[in-house]
């Protein structure tokens, strides 16, 4: 009886240890792509988004006019693609 309890305990402890080791290695693998992508797409601190005189697709068109190829939706006040029912 004692040997069976000890073997079950050791088996359970081994499974827990295996789980912890696998989880640790998996979390390290998940961090690697994040670090790689952040270094590839690193943005310069001085980089600023260029201001446009017109609003692009799905942007508000209350104060700005829509860029060429888009029309201002009268219902939603967004710049959308022109369609026959929007003319």
Swiss-Prot record:
<feature type="disulfide bond">
    <location>
        <begin position="61"/>
        <end position="72"/>
    </location>
</feature>
<comment type="similarity">
    <text>Belongs to the neurotoxin 10 (Hwtx-1) family. 51 (Hntx-8) subfamily. Hntx-8 sub-subfamily.</text>
</comment>
<comment type="function">
    <text>Ion channel inhibitor.</text>
</comment>
<dbReference type="GO" id="GO:0005576">
    <property type="term" value="C:extracellular region"/>
</dbReference>
<feature type="signal peptide">
    <location>
        <begin position="1"/>
        <end position="24"/>
    </location>
</feature>
<dbReference type="GO" id="GO:0008200">
    <property type="term" value="F:ion channel inhibitor activity"/>
</dbReference>
<feature type="disulfide bond">
    <location>
        <begin position="66"/>
        <end position="79"/>
    </location>
</feature>
<protein>
    <recommendedName>
        <fullName>U3-theraphotoxin-Hhn1a 12</fullName>
    </recommendedName>
</protein>
<keyword id="KW-0732">Signal</keyword>
<dbReference type="Pfam" id="PF07740">
    <property type="entry name" value="Toxin_12"/>
</dbReference>
<keyword id="KW-0800">Toxin</keyword>
<feature type="disulfide bond">
    <location>
        <begin position="54"/>
        <end position="67"/>
    </location>
</feature>
<feature type="propeptide">
    <location>
        <begin position="25"/>
        <end position="52"/>
    </location>
</feature>
<dbReference type="GO" id="GO:0090729">
    <property type="term" value="F:toxin activity"/>
</dbReference>
<keyword id="KW-1015">Disulfide bond</keyword>
<keyword id="KW-0872">Ion channel impairing toxin</keyword>
<keyword id="KW-0960">Knottin</keyword>
<dbReference type="InterPro" id="IPR011696">
    <property type="entry name" value="Huwentoxin-1"/>
</dbReference>
<dbReference type="InterPro" id="IPR013140">
    <property type="entry name" value="Huwentoxin_CS1"/>
</dbReference>
<keyword id="KW-0964">Secreted</keyword>
């Amino acid at each position: 009886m004692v040997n069976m309890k000890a073997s079950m305990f050791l088996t359970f402890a081994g499974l827990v240890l295996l789980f912890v080791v696998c989880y640790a290695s998996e979390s390290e693998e998940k961090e690697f792509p994040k670090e790689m992508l952040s270094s590839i797409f690193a943005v310069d601190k001085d980089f600023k988004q260029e201001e446009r005189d017109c609003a692009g697709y799905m942007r508000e068109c209350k104060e700005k006019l829509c860029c060429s190829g888009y029309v201002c939706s009268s219902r939603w006040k967004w710049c959308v693609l022109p369609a026959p029912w929007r003319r």
